[in-house]
Design a protein with these regions (language model features):
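Conserved HGGG/HGGXW glycine-rich cap/lid loop of the alpha/beta-hydrolase fold
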Residues: 4-53
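Active-site loop/oxyanion-hole signature of alpha/beta-hydrolase fold enzymes
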Residues: 28-32, 41-77, 245
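Gly/Ala-rich beta-loop-alpha elbow adjacent to hydrolase catalytic centers
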Residues: 78-82, 86
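Flexible "cap/lid" loop of the alpha/beta hydrolase fold
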Residues: 91, 96-132
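Conserved alpha/beta-hydrolase catalytic His-Asp/Glu region
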Residues: 131-184, 188-189
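Short beta-strand/loop motif that positions the catalytic acidic residue
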Residues: 193, 199-201
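Acidic catalytic loop of the alpha/beta-hydrolase fold
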Residues: 204-208
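Catalytic histidine-centered segment of alpha/beta-hydrolase-like enzymes
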Residues: 231-244
């Protein structure tokens, strides 16, 4: 059974990949704005939204599911966990990716030593909570994503509406996603990316600290980076117009 895709607009192919616990509906506003410039492809990842019947336990399993209907030579935009997916596609299925954009993402989400990120005990707590009450856990995660942003309440409302507008995620895939956030480390592989890369961050993000952006300036010196001052983990919602502008400028350079 194929993944659920929505395609709109005309022009160069651009793929939008959502994050953990969410689905493609989070991109609705972004897709509408970008479809004036691109042919926009929005996917529900395995286990999420209209692809909730599917399951993938690793980045490569997600990639294999995406390859069935993904356009070749496209711009890939990945938010949060979706950034790991888009980076994996760039590294392992390069025919499909012409440019890479990561949004509020990190090659390694879990904190370790000097590397900033989500504390492992927070991820463990999420895993435990997920088993007990996955709907409540997703709501907590939404609040965590929006925390710090001046429009936090509105952001959470939009995220919640997006998630609830489609079938609830598959708990097995939610657990697999948390394992990826806890264990995946692509830092050493970034040097092998040969396509143009843009990294977008929210200055107020509590999940991907601003320091990660600075560290990645050294790990991926060929890439470009931009920090949204008023955003936390969802700059495409908080600063929607500026977000689309950054994408358009990067892809037309």
């Amino acid at each position: 059974m194929a993944l659920y895709w929505q395609v709109s607009g005309q022009g160069q192919d651009l793929v939008l990949v959502h994050g953990w616990g969410m689905n493609g509906a989070v991109w609705q506003q972004t897709a509408e704005a970008l479809s004036a410039h691109f042919r926009v492809h929005v996917v529900d990842l395995p286990g999420y939204g209209h692809s909730a019947e599917q399951h993938a336990a690793s980045l490569e399993e997600i990639a294999q599911a995406l390859l069935e209907n993904a356009p070749r030579n496209a711009i890939w935009v990945g938010w949060s966990l979706g950034g790991l997916v888009a980076t994996h596609m760039t590294l392992h299925h390069p025919d499909y990716v012409s440019k890479l954009v990561t949004v509020a993402s990190s090659p390694k989400f879990a904190a370790q030593g000097n590397w900033r990120g989500i504390q492992p005990d927070v991820l463990t707590a999420f895993t435990d909570q997920l088993v007990a009450d996955f709907q409540l856990t997703i709501e907590r995660f939404m609040a965590l994503q929006a925390m710090g942003s001046p429009s936090a309440r509105q952001d959470v409302k939009v995220l919640k509406q997006a998630v609830l507008s489609r079938p609830m995620p598959n708990p097995q895939s939610l657990l697999a996603g948390l394992t990826m956030l806890a264990e995946v480390d692509l830092r050493d592989e970034l040097q092998h990316i040969s396509v143009p890369m843009l990294r977008l961050y929210g200055r107020l993000d509590g999940l991907v600290p601003a320091k990660v952006a600075r560290d990645l300036n050294h790990l991926a010196p060929y890439s470009e980076a931009f920090m949204f001052d008023q955003s936390s983990h969802a700059p495409f919602m908080t600063e929607a117009e500026a977000f689309c502008q950054q994408l358009i400028e990067f892809t037309t350079r």
